[in-house]
Amino acid sequence: MCAIVGIINSKDAAKTAYYALFSMQHRGQEASGISVCNDGEISTHKGNGLVTEVFNEKVLSSLKGDMAIGHNRYATAGKNSGRDAQPIAANYALGQISIVHNGNLVNKDEVRDELIKDGAIFQTNMDTENIIHLIARNHDEHLQDRIIAALDKIKGAYCLLVQSRHKTFAIRDRWGVRPLSLGRLKDGGYIVASETCAFDLVGATFMRDVRPGEMIVFEHGKNEFQSLQIFEPEPRVCAFEYIYFARPDSVIEGKSVYEVRKKMGEVLAKKSKVKADFVVPVPDSGVPAALGYANESKIPFELAITRNHYVGRTFIEPSQEMRNLKVKLKLNPMSSVLAGKSIVVIDDSIVRGTTSKKVVDLLRHAGAKEIHFRVACPELKYPERYGIDTPSFEELISAKKSVEEVREYIGADSLEFLSIDELKESIGNERKYSLVSFDGDYFIK
């Protein structure tokens, strides 16, 4: 899972891209980068670390231009090295090009092997580089046609921004697995970003979502853009965006992430009634669902677990050893609130079980008498291959254990999940979603 942003025909584009990336830091913490186009020349700065670690005022001042694309990296393909930061910039027959990508290509190894057999030399471990090579090795006269031809050869989930010396292309796969939205900046320029929370920070107005299978073409110096439906749309936005990844203040496909998460809590409360003194969220991602649960159940809401906000997300850390330590560093329950109490604990998901087990242990040590664990999504039973880092069945506790076995493992007094139908009800039944982590329907093959 990554964040991408494009700033088109706007003064100080790099600085605007920087702020947009900062607002989407939750989507990737391993690396960050920005490419700008100035007078037909593309310059790129990128590196490992948070947005604020990679960029400073001096760097941003050097990135001059009114066209920019940017990226926050969360590794799903490749390793966490400086080489694998995006954007990827290259020179080819039609000039300079830079590209950023959010998603995952399921046929990346097959495509890479074919390209290497044909003489291609790869500089990174990223599947994104496949697209650069496919574009460069095509002989069509126009970049637009080369991009479309390249996308015909890849399979997977992707949102792409491709920058040339004179144009920027925004593309979303036919399923629209990953979100991508279009907005208008105050100076008349455009912004394209993974989440609408970026629009709020930079003062942009939301226009619409980039449609599944759509390519939007922006030209340097022109106020209008061109919309092309390059693939037949088969919409299936990823349900996990609503459950966990997106910021609660974002809107995806017309749905407020915050309101969807509250609805998940309400549905949970209706299906799993239990007597308790408090409803306690696992912060921060469990808070909206806990509010919904408390509202529906009439059980008081308590922020009885304090989160250290200077510790990153446990789910997207590369090593299990680091995750174990970070749970303790990140969460601290309040004994003064919890001692002798029966509580309902709400979390957005159980992936590996690491965090849930630690949370229950911490709550027991804080004096909680009964712990009823409620999860605002179904059991994660299948690896997600479209941009979320769950590469094997072995890492998914619900792939190997029943609900009762998971309950026993994490040490809770009771455990309930939303069903798939209840998840659909919470988001809205009017469209299809990517539910591959829950139902194993790998619709991109």
Task: Write out the residue ranges for each language-model feature.
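Conserved short alpha-helical segments that host acidic/polar catalytic motifs at enzyme active sites
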Residues: 1-212, 217-276, 282, 370
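A conserved beta-strand->alpha-helix junction
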Residues: 55, 124, 129, 301-312, ...
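Flexible loop/turn segments at secondary-structure boundaries
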Residues: 76-77, 107, 177-178, 199-201, ...
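Secondary-structure transition/capping motifs at alpha-helix termini
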Residues: 120, 141, 273-276, 295-302, ...
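Amphipathic alpha-helical
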Residues: 130-141, 283, 295-313
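PRPP-dependent phosphoribosyltransferase catalytic core
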Residues: 166, 203-209, 361-445
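Extended, hydrophobic alpha-helical segments in both membrane/secreted and soluble proteins
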Residues: 279, 286-293, 297, 301, ...
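Short, glycine/charge-rich flexible loops or terminal/linker lids adjacent to PRPP-binding catalytic cores
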Residues: 298-344, 354, 381-391
